[in-house]
Design a protein with these regions (language model features):
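Glycine-rich phosphate-binding loop used to anchor ATP phosphates in small-molecule kinases
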Residues: 54-95, 99
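Pre-Walker A (Motif I) flank of P-loop NTPase domains
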Residues: 1-4, 71
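Small-molecule kinase domains that catalyze NTP-dependent phosphoryl transfer to phosphate-bearing small molecules
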Residues: 120-171
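Conserved beta-strand scaffold positions in the cores of enzyme catalytic domains, especially
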Residues: 31, 99-101, 158-162
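Conserved substrate/cofactor phosphate-moiety recognition/catalytic segment
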Residues: 13-69
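P-loop (Walker A) phosphate-binding loop of NTP-binding proteins
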Residues: 10
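Hydrophobic anchor at the beta1->P-loop junction of P-loop NTPases
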Residues: 7
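Conserved phosphate-donor/acceptor-positioning beta-strand/loop module used by diverse small-molecule
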Residues: 95-116
Length: 186
């Protein structure tokens, strides 16, 4: 069955990398990385430029259209707002698709360090690093991590996949196994 696969997790945990790999191995899958859509909205570089509220409705429409055509969508995006998550779930159900939640996790301190050590030289990464610093840096990231753990209590069907720094192949294999398990359960 067609599915909207939501890869949740703290910033820098590997969501985008794993989603891109998954989409490459599954032709026709839409890699709906919302962070790549920011460049389409004027003013995204400003520190006040928090455009997720503008982009999520676009993502819902894109996901719904792709799912309705019978194709999978993988969504690598940190989402801890229960209402936002439920909307993505409803988009999947409206298209007669499954909604599969995978949460990528590392230890809290390791997750924070992973965010702080990533630097691909891109304008987006610089912008994101500045934004996080302006919001409180490590303390802000720790709060994001803690909210994600709290969300898991409200989302018992979400599967946790351990994301280990430097072990992208192993994490990708663990993700594939988790998805196989969910799909086998139907």
């Amino acid at each position: 069955m067609t599915a909207l696969i939501h890869l949740n997790g703290p910033p820098g945990i590997g969501k985008s990398t794993l989603a891109a790999r998954y989409a490459d191995r599954h032709p026709g899958t839409l890699n709906l990385d919302i962070d790549t859509l920011h460049h389409l909205i004027g003013g995204w570089r400003t520190s006040q430029g928090q455009f997720h509220d503008l982009l999520r409705p676009l993502a819902w429409a894109m996901a719904g259209t792709h799912l309705a055509d019978g194709r999978d969508v993988i969504l690598p995006q940190y989402v801890c707002d229960l209402t936002q998550l439920q909307i993505f779930e409803q988009v999947a159900h409206d298209a007669d698709a499954d909604f599969i939640e995978i949460v990528l996790l590392d230890d809290r301190d390791a997750a924070i360090e992973r965010f702080n050590s990533r630097d691909d030289g891109s304008e987006w990464t610089r912008h994101n690093n500045e934004l996080v610093a302006d919001l409180g840096g490590d303390e802000f990231l720790a709060g994001m991590y803690d909210r994600l753990l709290s969300l898991l209590d409200a989302r018992p069907d979400a599967l946790v996949v351990r994301s280990v720094l430097g072990a992208i192949d192993g994490t990708a294999t663990a993700l594939d196994r988790a998805l196989e398990t969910v799909r086998a359960q139907g």
